[in-house]
């Protein structure tokens, strides 16, 4: 982990053959802790921490097959609406 301030990331992982959500979530939760990860959908997670997007990508490298993909996005600003997003979790992380 770097010495920078924590930020919000979105991790999207997809496969034509299998659902990757649990596999990817477990791998990331092992590194950052379950309290800083929220599942957004079958293919997407919100992750809060002082990790570079490339670090998170590299954690997933050994899990994904050649035909599977992952994208890690880092946000400077965000906003949310509706019950599908854990508002209390976001508020506690600078929302």
Protein language model regions, located:
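Short glycine-/aliphatic-rich beta-strand segments at the starts of folded cytosolic domains
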Residues: 2-16
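Generic detector of low-complexity/intrinsically disordered segments
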Residues: 10, 22-25, 47, 92
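Short, flexible beta-strand-to-coil junctions
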Residues: 14-19, 75-77
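N-terminal start-of-chain detector that recognizes signal peptides
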Residues: 16-20, 42-45
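Conserved, structured core segments of small domains
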Residues: 19-31
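Short, intrinsically disordered low-complexity segments
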Residues: 31-76
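Short, low-order "capping/linker" segments at domain edges
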Residues: 54-59, 80-95
